[in-house]
Amino acid sequence: AEDLHSGSRAAIVGGITSVFEMPNTNPPTTNFEEFQKKISLGKRMYCNHAFYFGATAENYQLLEKLKDLNGCCGIKLFAGSSTGNLLVDKEDDIEKVFKHASKVVAVHSEDEEILKLRKKLIEKGNVKTHPIWRNEEVAISSTRKIVKIAKRLNKKAHILHVTTKEEVDFLSQNKGNITFEITPQHLTMYAPDCYDKLGSYAQMNPPIRDKSHYERLWYAVRNNYNDT
């Protein structure tokens, strides 16, 4: 199994010099005790590193105390369900996270309510249904909501792994305290080809989408719309 030691070695071999480690681990990084354990374990890493502090529906008061926390690169918010159990999907709880945040909030932006409604579209054994279930509306609906909350509370939000042309257009028009990321896997593959070639190895959240989204992501990169 990958750990901080082996993962950082792989990063260096791949030409990556710095990593921000996510909090959806076992145990999750959602309190100061677990965060300090990560700092100690980080001494075995080969590359530059920092750690996200995971937001939950219950730990929002801790988020006020992160401003000067050494080694903390930000707060991670899972607005849609993914790996781990750090889901914060109720709008009131999302608002509490932003209200108490003392660092940038990096968001896995998918609308959990829409995900639940569309779950019936999953066909067991057919990975091509993954982007149908987690469709474009799942992403853009959540991203609009996150931006609205962040702007109203004058907080910084960083939308992670953007996958849709709708999000690119929307986020490009709402910069300032709002930044966004496009990841290599969404710039090197598109559906349905990736699922034909790689099967479930191409399955991720949010999913790899069709070529029209792939092309808009590249358009954003070439025109410096995305921030990371």
Where are these regions (language model features)?
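Short secondary-structure boundary/capping elements
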Residues: 2-3, 30-34, 58, 134-142
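Short, acidic/polar
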Residues: 2-8, 57-68
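Acidic, glycine-rich active-site loops and adjacent beta-strand->loop/helix elements
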Residues: 24-28, 53-57, 81
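Histidine/acidic residue-rich metal-binding segments in metalloenzymes
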Residues: 61-228
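A glycine-rich helix N-cap at a beta->alpha junction
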Residues: 40-55
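Metal-associated gating/positioning segment near the N- to mid-region
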Residues: 1-44
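Short catalytic-loop micro-motif centered on adjacent basic/acidic residues
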Residues: 20-21, 50-53, 156-161
